[in-house]
Amino acid sequence: MRKFNCIDLFAGLGGLSTGAVMAGHNVIWAGNHWDTAVEYHQLNHPNTEHVCQDLQQANFYQLPSYDCLLASPACQGHSLGRGRDLARHEVSRSTAWAVVEALEAGSPPLFEVENVEKFTDWNLFKAWKYAIESLGYSLSINLLDAADYGVPQNRLRNFIIGTKSKKPLPLKLEKQAPVTARSVIDLDSGNWSPIKTKRRSPKTLARIERGRRELKTDTFLIPYYSSGSGLTGRSLDRPIGTLTTVDRYGIVRGDEMRMLTVDEMRKFMSFPDDTKLPPQHKIATKLLGNAVPPLLQKQILEYVAAAA
């Protein structure tokens, strides 16, 4: 199997990097504008060179020599939950165009871009794709659900693979049996509280009652927003739904409930047990919710390395 020297643009907690290392590759450089993300990426990848800056202003000609570019550009402008502050999101971190600049400067034989499902609906996606193809790359666009590949979470994302070849390299990964939320959640841990309190939202109480009726159980997951299972509940005998950058899922057990612990979120994202995370629940949740599941990334790069 070929061994890649990788760089990681927009490196947060390091799902792309961690998966690459799990697949036997090196991550030699990583960058992000957020100092906390860089701090924890560095703690988890101490042998990687790190920079903290807006990557739209980076000089990619100064990067060390590499042969695989990994990138997860900002997804806020493409996701369904982007809200009304798109302008703030667009200036808060570099966009997908930084990938084009890096590819033009480094001309690696391989790259991988991860983003949300709606990324391909972006008004400038065709122009972005054309710009990359003009640099000599063939692109395959692969919509993958992490739950199909051993990750205990339904997480649908685009993985775009670019190669300097005449034909694209589509990802044909072997699917696996689903891993359930029950296998991750520790019902004996966490801070449980009574369901019926004065502070509990009537909408939350209604969702819990609907969950009891629909699932015919007193122990289940309750999303705090969304549609579908967000209106009722979610069985522990299926993968959890998509984790985001804020607390999204609670666990109902009889007449009490609690939110997911950071350690449970780490497991749902398939990060290794020795992953270093911030002690603050809110910051750890944000880093995990922005990440790529390393277990899926490992399989992607194993497949690409064998096929490239």
Name the predicted role of every residue range.
Residues L9-L13:
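Class I SAM-dependent methyltransferase "Motif I" SAM/SAH-binding loop
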Residues A58-C68, C75-S235, T242:
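Class I S-adenosyl-L-methionine
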Residues W34-D35:
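Conserved SAM/SAH-binding beta-strand->alpha-helix loop
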Residues N47-D54:
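Conserved SAM-binding strand-loop segment of SAM-dependent methyltransferases
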Residues H41:
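Conserved SAM-binding loop
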Residues R2, G19-N26, N44:
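A short, Lys/Arg-enriched amphipathic alpha-helix followed by its capping loop at the start of a domain
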